[in-house]
A protein has these predicted regions:
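C-terminal accessory subdomains/tails of enzymes that are appended
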Residues: 1-209
Length: 209
């Protein structure tokens, strides 16, 4: 959980450029986490440590990675695989992740140009279609199939959120979610985007899974 000092630090930084200024009583939710940084004996504070990752071979047949961040996960994976390939004496090929589109990426731009048609045919509003395209890309077709089978799942999950109920069903039927926490914290961004980490949505989510 974020401390008061964490919250005040963010407010101070944001208020350097925002007008009107943000106030602590306007915050609807906070979170904090630990970043796995690579130690550096020359640095006395974590704020000056590099966010880069490092790949190591601490023992024969064992490749490890430390540091890094969410946004560089594909580069991290590539570096680990490529190092493992060396260990395997090139019995397999190096990583090809940079050539592989993310799931749902193929056809995304064509569908984005057709969002009005998709909205008209599905009965959804255009903003919801844009939300679904940004979350699922070309896999939006699987969400639309769920709605076609159960039209009531096209309704919103909370008036102030972009999510629809079909996404909760999809999380369990297609993405392996097994609990309310799986859905709120992992398959969606409700724990970040909803007030109080989405706790007030728990009963509604539970009824859908």
């Amino acid at each position: 959980l974020a401390s008061k000092e964490d919250v005040q630090y963010i407010l101070d930084q944001a208020n350097r450029v925002l007008e009107p200024k943000l106030r602590a009583d306007e915050i609807i939710g906070v979170y904090a986490g630990l970043r796995p940084l690579v130690a550096n004996n020359k640095s006395a504070t974590t704020t000056k440590l590099s966010r880069e990752h490092t790949v190591d071979r601490p023992a024969a047949g064992f490749v490890s990675i430390a540091g890094g961040k969410y946004t560089t996960y594909r580069v991290m994976a590539k570096d680990v695989v490529d190092r493992a390939v060396i260990e395997l004496r090139r019995l397999t090929q190096e990583s090809v992740t940079e050539k592989l589109p993310l799931i749902g990426a193929d056809g995304y731009f064509a569908l984005e140009q057709q969002k009005e048609r998709i909205a008209q045919e599905s009965g959804l509003d255009v903003e919801t279609v844009k939300h679904l395209l940004n979350r699922y890309g070309a896999l939006i077709s699987e969400i639309l199939e769920i709605i076609e089978e159960q039209p009531k799942l096209a309704t919103k999950l909370g008036a102030d959120l972009p999510y629809i109920k079909a996404e909760i069903v999809y999380a369990t039927s297609h993405e392996g979610a097994r609990s309310v926490d799986d859905v709120i914290s992992r398959r969606t961004r409700l724990s970040f985007e909803a007030v109080n980490h989405g706790v007030h949505l728990a009963d509604e989510v539970a009824a859908l899974i």
